Amino acid sequence: MVSLAPNNSAPVPEKRLVLWIILLILLGASMLLSLGIGRFSVSVSNVISILLGNILPIEPTWKPVEERVVELIRMPRILIAALAGAGLAVAGAALQGVFRNPLVGPQIIGVSSGAAFGGALAILVSESQVLLIGAAFGFGMLAMLVVYTISRQQGRASILMLVLSGIVTSAFFSALVSITKFVADPDDKLPAIVFWLMGSFASASYEKVLLIGVPVVSGALVVYFMRFQINILSLGDEEAQSLGLKVERTRWIVLVAVALISAAVVAAAGIVGWVGLVIPHFARLLTGANHNVLIPAAALIGAIYLIHVDNVARASIAAEIPVGIITALLGAPVFAYLLRRAANKGWTSE
């Protein structure tokens, strides 16, 4: 099993500063370039001029339609993609640390499937965005509770039981989603549910930026404030208890924060899978397993990753590809590789 406990491989402060600068530059450049990418292309110079025109008295040299595309269509979409990527990456890093398991993520342990059912049910009965995020959070938390309860053996959650419990729980909630689609109005509710479930930022707006931003930032801040406790949990329950940590309470605080993040992303963008599983591994390669550094690094990398995935989704072909399809195509092979590597190291023993 891959150790997720803090070690001495984390970068020294000077290298850490360089890492933050590089990631922040990449994030800013990614957002800037993405504002010009799409079926209606806008040059980088015009994008910069449009943005500066909001704060400086610049004579417009761009077309009004370019300004509308950049500020009203692409900007909220990119902000939502960045928030979703950062939130899911933070959630995945937190779950992997809490469970001492590099193979878990919001989708693997059933949170996404539970939130998907809650969201689909909310769409079926109402058009309220508040109900959508509330139902997604409630059922996402319920799914996590079921998985965690089933997977516990002799006072701990084993890797094998955790993955299997996640598969079972995901299958159950997927069946409930299928029932919801079966009874939905085929001319109204069904298309809305199906398109939403595939994951997309096409319906982005500044209202949705607020919808996803408040819970994602709140949940991510809770996780970050718990980073030292997650480091201790990564040592194991017995070691954590011997150091005076209240293991169950700490774990549940983190789990509630993760469920809030996942539910907000599902409510705003549908199912965007595999980000929370894959991105923490790449972040860990750069920072080591110390969550003091890992969590913010995962957030930045996740934001950059999902921004570029969305670029591919909306610019590769004439018809927009759902983001969830692309993340699954990229994430599933990585998960298969991780499973194989863990199996070779005797993953069933933990």
State where each predicted segment sits.
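Alpha-helical transmembrane segments in inner-membrane proteins
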Residues: 2-350
